[in-house]
């Protein structure tokens, strides 16, 4: 009997319609297709569950071939300097070598004044992020420190990894930057506190610098929103400065505090707090969260280490010293000569308040001296400055005389052995034989 005959046993009408519309071969393979789909969905669900944030008490840092390590931060160390590593001077060689010695499994690259523009064009040009505004802005900036700050943010956004200034020494392997209680897969930025002095937040000069994260060394994943926010904030800020000064970006003049707040630690800190707050479900994140922290903490997927980690030995902010177990790097500051081109406020008599190094008594005394000076008439101020300059000249002359007298004394001391030979030592005879001594006694 034909299966199409009206007299054949048919079952339900829907089943007949399904058999008529679906080929027999496909019906036979259908269970296999369904099984494959189930397996694919199961695999996808396992991957999804594995990527979900884990409670801290269950989190473990995986081994070399674990899933956490393969999804970790790029194993790349970046630095920038005037010249390539083969042309480094001794002090740059010594600090740079610590990064490769302590981290043999990491790649290492230095961008220089000769290849930085090519890097920016490659990654932010038409074949990269296609941001001609960023490329043009970087091309027009002439201030070395501004370009150095911009470049580190652009590198980290494009490729991620570890960035360190050329005068930073690595004390511990990068693998120790993330404590074991955290899962590396849950983090996308590792930073440290640099200055933790909120008591000075209202000071007219120190206020903007009193609470900041360190940006001479940090670790980031590529595409981090903090890095792009920094680049775009700097672009807008430079445009405003150029407009206010009525000059092109290439000709802007910046003082020390403008650099700090525009591209340096203050700008870095603001961008970090903004991103933390945007990610937070409990309201804005302020510096109170990081004031006086003894250990590291994670906020909005950003690991913040205490001041001792990246900024030990500063003499303030409870920064400890470089011999402690918690100190990860050491900043030598030998490449930090940019303030000479971007001077900070220096009073003609009382100097810079930064020389107080955040000592509260010193800062109060400096403020009082400045207030007393400002209360004088212009003629009195001029006389005070002249008296101070004359006193400095007198002290310089006295110091020079002391130095010359010291040289004469050292020269005479060096020539004295030639003029007065040392006295001859008395001749010492070897001890006599005991038997001979007895004979002499008998005589």
Predicted regions located by residue number:
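Glycosyltransferase-associated regions of secretory-pathway enzymes
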Residues: 2-148, 164-443
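Small-residue hinge/turn detector
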Residues: 149-161
